[in-house]
Amino acid sequence: MAETSKADGGRLTTHVLDTATGKPAAGLSIALYRLDGSARTHLKTVATNADGRCDAALLAGAEFRAGEYELVFAAGDYLRGQGTKLPEPAFLDSVPIRFGMAEAVHYHVPLLISPYGYSTYRGS
């Protein structure tokens, strides 16, 4: 994917891969929050499609603002829905990822999950 120009206003995307099965994590719920000091504002909740991606950018164009954000991935619900036996409480249930976006370009924040671990990075 090419970076979005500053004139386009930037965008935020994500995708989720289940590293235990080697497949996209379809149907995983993701909540997006904007952080402003101690305030945390819910912007939207979406679910991943069959490819583990969201059907549209989480933020794009006029919706995009530089700042601090948080994505909360409902990993436990997804894993239980796949038939994965998890202890109660689950080792990983909600997986929060906090990050900053400083300029109006494309930010891609993927998540790789399994019942006992996860990783993320700034993708392209």
Curated annotation (Swiss-Prot):
Its EC number is 3.5.2.17. Gene3D superfamilies: Transthyretin/hydroxyisourate hydrolase domain. The keyword Hydrolase applies. Keywords: Hydrolase, Purine metabolism. The keyword Hydrolase applies. Substrate binds at H15, R53, Y121. One of its GO terms (biological process) is purine nucleobase metabolic process. It catalyses: 5-hydroxyisourate + H2O = 5-hydroxy-2-oxo-4-ureido-2,5-dihydro-1H-imidazole-5-carboxylate + H(+). One of its GO terms (molecular function) is hydroxyisourate hydrolase activity. Catalyzes the hydrolysis of 5-hydroxyisourate (HIU) to 2-oxo-4-hydroxy-4-carboxy-5-ureidoimidazoline (OHCU). Belongs to the transthyretin family. 5-hydroxyisourate hydrolase subfamily. HIU hydrolysis also occurs spontaneously, but more slowly. Homotetramer. This is 5-hydroxyisourate hydrolase. It comes from Mesorhizobium japonicum (strain LMG 29417 / CECT 9101 / MAFF 303099) (Mesorhizobium loti (strain MAFF 303099)). The lineage of its organism: Bacteria, Pseudomonadati, Pseudomonadota, Alphaproteobacteria, Hyphomicrobiales.
